[in-house]
Amino acid sequence: MCESALLERLVATTSGYPSWSVLRQAVHKRRPVHLAVMVEPFLSYILDGKKSIESRFSKYAIAPFYQIEPGDLVLLKLTGGPVIGCFTTDSVEFVALNERERERLQRHYSVAICADGAFWEARQDKRYATLVGVRDVQILDPAPVAKSDRRGWVVLQTRRASHETDQLTLL
């Protein structure tokens, strides 16, 4: 299913839930919307306010690397389960990883990421990192998402290009 169809279905599915007004407003205002697929305990850490930075590490420069900005809406989906929360992006940092950068991230962000030694060890072969500051966390009524691919991050709606919003009148 393509990203726009996934977003449309999610908006339709959640139309009766007041807690989901944040998504409807984002879609209406063309605010970028992302879907982050998460495992426990990291999902609960965000919802509980313990985790203040969401991190994504990859071998390739894939989403959300250079595809997210402060103010974007991030929906939180449990792996194999529904979307149950969201947050607004507070800050972002994109890092091309090498040993020095990996050590810097570990030294400065382990607490905010809720990362232990095993976390960092599992990411030794990664070449890119995206750090996303978390603010305005909301718990949402659970909503199923018909997502069957293995991507851990999906950009559902991008920023409207300036040429899409500006019209020239020739009168």
Q: Which residues fall in each region the model found?
A:
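Short amphipathic
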Residues: 32-39, 86
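Conserved positions in beta-strands of structured domains
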Residues: 88-90
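Contiguous surface segments at macromolecular interaction interfaces
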Residues: 1-31, 59-60, 84, 95-171
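Short, well-ordered loop/turn sites that connect or cap secondary structure elements
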Residues: 46, 65-68
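Short, structured beta-strand/loop micro-motifs enriched in basic residues and often containing a Trp
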Residues: 34-36, 50-59
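Short, charged beta-turn/beta-strand-edge "cap" motif at the junction between a beta-strand
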Residues: 77-82
